[in-house]
Amino acid sequence: MDLKGKNILVVGLARTGVAVARFLAAQGARVTVTDLRDEAALAGPLEQLAGHPVSYVLGRHDEADFAAAETVVVSPGVPQESPYLQAARRAGREVITEIELASRFITAPLVAITGTNGKTTTTTLTGELFAGCGFRTFVGGNIGNPLIELVETGAAVDRVVVEISSFQLEWIRSFRPTVAVLLNITEDHLDRYATYQEYIDAKARIFKNQTASDWAVLNVDDPIVAGLAGRTCAAVFPMSRQRELGEGIFYRDGAIIFRHAGRQERFPTDRFRITGVHNIENIMASLAAALLLGCDADRALACVEAFGGLPHRMELVRELNGVRYFEDSKATNVGSVEKALASFNDITLIAGGKDKGGSYAPLAGLVAERVRHMILIGEAKDRMARELGHLTDTRMAVTLEDAVELAASLTQPGGVVLFSPACSSFDMFRDYEERAQRFRAAVDALSPGGTP
């Protein structure tokens, strides 16, 4: 793809925008960067672009810039309804994200992983599997390094693994993964999408450009994911935690079984360091992608057994007085909380935060069956209480610290205190990481008697 002399507008000057602008300028494009933040707020990014032939429109956007550019490279956080993007589209301009741009320069087999939950763990583990099996591997996308940084450096790689969000998928045109992994779909981002179906359709775009020589790894236990099999031209490779498959990857009798073209590999799970039903699914997806693209089964098993997981995803913080305290602050939607609840019994659940607009009703069965006490916090607590509070003993707390103290007083030995919010953190905290740290500090502050 020849970029020399092309008029390209880069929208947003965060890390990805800086990398895109730098790459485009090096390719000889005529680059303009626009950001609603002013020069003072962008001192760091501007310093990184010093010396590069880039023009700036800062503190505002100008529709004329969007209409004049041949291509607009937009941050995935900008909604399609933006009047500036609408101006570009009315003028017939190409609007893409960094993932689409970068993919046009990549020749190595590419694994793209999406889903409502589990993307980051699965992406990270898949990268570990390829690297552990001797492949030069790049891991990035919606996590860590922007994909364009691989293109910019010109590094030679054998495999590329990217996490990709629904927002990024909205703008793809030719992006084509060799293996597309769809883990699950549950209600999320309804503050961005007008309907749940719009969100589903955005996720399904991961298959848009696949051909019969590609693979689509689908979690067929999820009825919505299973129903999308007809949207891909790729060969479907199913995965299931609930039933045996003649072809695909599945869980049975304490082991993950991979079956493909007469080959069978068995991966016992007893030595895995990450636990929970959701992690069995994440591991199955990673193994499927890795083995389909040439990984050795024995080396892959060793990598899985060594993998310790990622922070803030159902981590054991402490065991005190026979009670285990788990921090799952990354569980910002109902689907992820479902998987957490399915992993334990005798639960004291701490949940709540900023409401994201979806229904909490899918949790009803698990709350009734497995949750002995539920303690609610944050803006969403009243609605959560209305939808779920009648199913178990339900209390309210003003702060997270109060909730931890209350949980410690209610939970009997052998029980689990699970902080799995089902909501975003922005009503009370800077982000889910600060929320996690506050929970951990509150748990660490408990005395052997169960109170601070």
Curated annotation (Swiss-Prot):
Gene3D superfamilies, per the entry: Mur ligase, C-terminal domain (3.90.190.20), Mur-like, catalytic domain (3.40.1190.10), NAD(P)-binding Rossmann-like Domain (3.40.50.720)
Pfam families found in the cross-reference section: Mur_ligase_C (PF02875), Mur_ligase_M (PF08245), MurD-like_N (PF21799)
Record flagged with keyword ATP-binding: yes
EC number(s) from the headed UniProt entry: 6.3.2.9
Highest taxon listed in the record's lineage: Bacteria
Record GO terms (molecular function): ATP binding; UDP-N-acetylmuramoylalanine-D-glutamate ligase activity
One record GO biological process: cell division
Reaction(s) the record says it catalyses: UDP-N-acetyl-alpha-D-muramoyl-L-alanine + D-glutamate + ATP = UDP-N-acetyl-alpha-D-muramoyl-L-alanyl-D-glutamate + ADP + phosphate + H(+)
Residues noted as binding ATP in the record, renumbered to the chain: 115-121
GO cellular component term of the entry, any: cytoplasm
Localization terms from the record: Cytoplasm
Pathway(s) annotated for this protein in UniProt: Cell wall biogenesis; peptidoglycan biosynthesis
Enzyme class name: ligase
Keyword entries, A-Z: ATP-binding, Cell cycle, Cell division, Cell shape, Cell wall biogenesis/degradation, Cytoplasm, Ligase, Nucleotide-binding, Peptidoglycan synthesis
Primary site of residence: cytoplasm
Family: Belongs to the MurCDEF family.
Protein purpose: Cell wall formation. Catalyzes the addition of glutamate to the nucleotide precursor UDP-N-acetylmuramoyl-L-alanine (UMA).
Entries under NCBIfam families matching the protein: murD (TIGR01087)
Protein name: UDP-N-acetylmuramoylalanine--D-glutamate ligase
Species this protein is from: Geobacter sulfurreducens (strain ATCC 51573 / DSM 12127 / PCA)
Annotated gene: murD
